[in-house]
Amino acid sequence: LLEGFLVGGGVPGPGTACLTKALKDSGDLLVELAVIICAYQNGKDLQEQDFKELKELLERTLERAGCALDDIVADLGLEELLGSIGVSTGDIIQGLYKLLKELKIDETVFNAVCDVTKKMLDNKCLPKILQGDLVKFLKDLKYKVCIEGGDPELIIKDLKIILERLPCVLGGVGLDDLFKNIFVKDGILSFEGIAKPLGDLLILVLCPNVKNINVSS
C-alpha cells in the first residue's frame, strides 16, 4: 500500500513531505489526526454520513496544516491500487495511519488519544468534543498550560468548564469528587488518585514536556 509515498529515487512525494514537516511544526496535528483515525477504527456503528463527516474533518485538518489530502492520497498510490473500485474514506484513513507509522510518530501520544477517543465513542461523546468552540477552548487551554505556564488555579477553572460540557469522559466519576484530587501545591498543578488519568492525558496529549504538572497515584 505504501509503495507510492516515495517517488523518484526515494524522494518523498509532495503530500508526504508536507505531512512530515507539519507534524514536526505542530504537536496538535498528530492529536487531531489520531482522533480521526481512532474514530474510524473504533466506530462500530458509523453510518455513511459519519464517514463523509470524517473525511471532511480530515480535509479541513490537513488544510489548516498547509497540506492537501489529494496529495497524500496520490503519494499512497491508492487510486492506482484500487482503480475503478474507487477510494473510500476507510481506505484513505487506513493508508494515512500506515504512513504515520512509517513516519515514526509518537506512539505513546497516539495510543493515549486513541484510548480517549474510544471512550468518547462508547459514551456517544465524540461529536461534542469536535464542536468548534470547544476545540478552540481546548487549544487555548493547551497554550495556557504548555506555553505560558499559566496560573494553575485558573487552569483548574478552565478544566471544570470543559468537563462540565463533557461529562461523558469522566467514566462515572463525579465532578466534585474528581476536583477534590486536583490541587495546586508549590505552584505546581497536581493530579492524584481518581484524577490521575486526567493528569496523564494532559501531559501525554496536550504537552508531553510540561514542567508545571505533577501526577501521582
Curated annotation (Swiss-Prot):
Stable between 25 and 95 degrees Celsius. It is found in: Secreted. One of its GO terms (cellular component) is extracellular region. It comes from the Eukaryota. Keywords: Disulfide bond, Secreted. Disulfide bonds join 18-67, 38-114, 125-168, 146-207. Exclusively expressed in females in the early oviduct, the glandular part of the oviduct (pars convoluta dilata) and in the cloaca. Monomer. Acts as a surfactant. Is the major protein constituent (45%) of foam nests. Has no antimicrobial activity, no larvicidal activity, and is not toxic to mice. Mass spectrometry data suggest sequence microheterogeneity hinting at the existence of several isoforms. This is Ranaspumin. It comes from Leptodactylus vastus. The lineage of its organism: Eukaryota, Metazoa, Chordata, Craniata, Vertebrata.
